[in-house]
């Protein structure tokens, strides 16, 4: 059961995910539903999704270990 304080898990449209690529490597992205991020394994960056909009700016991305 979801309470009003919990944010329901959203998903990224499959077609959008097929179109979007990492702006650094031009490689594919993976959707992380728990963190609401698009992951670029090649660039080791996680691009945030805010209000359903992917923020595809390298300076906004979280660096992965």
From Swiss-Prot:
SUPFAM superfamilies: Trm112p-like
Pfam families: Trm112p (PF03966)
InterPro entries from the UniProt entry: Trm112-like
One Gene Ontology CC term in the entry: cytosol
Superkingdom of source: Bacteria
Family: Belongs to the UPF0434 family.
Name of this protein: UPF0434 protein RPD_0454
Source organism of the structure: Rhodopseudomonas palustris (strain BisB5)
């Amino acid at each position: 059961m979801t309470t009003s304080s919990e944010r329901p898990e959203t998903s990224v449209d499959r077609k959008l995910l097929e179109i979007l690529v990492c702006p650094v490597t031009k490689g594919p992205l993976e959707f992380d539903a728990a963190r609401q991020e698009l992951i670029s394994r090649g660039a080791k960056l996680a691009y945030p999704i805010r209000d359903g909009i992917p923020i595809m700016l390298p300076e906004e991305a979280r660096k992965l270990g």
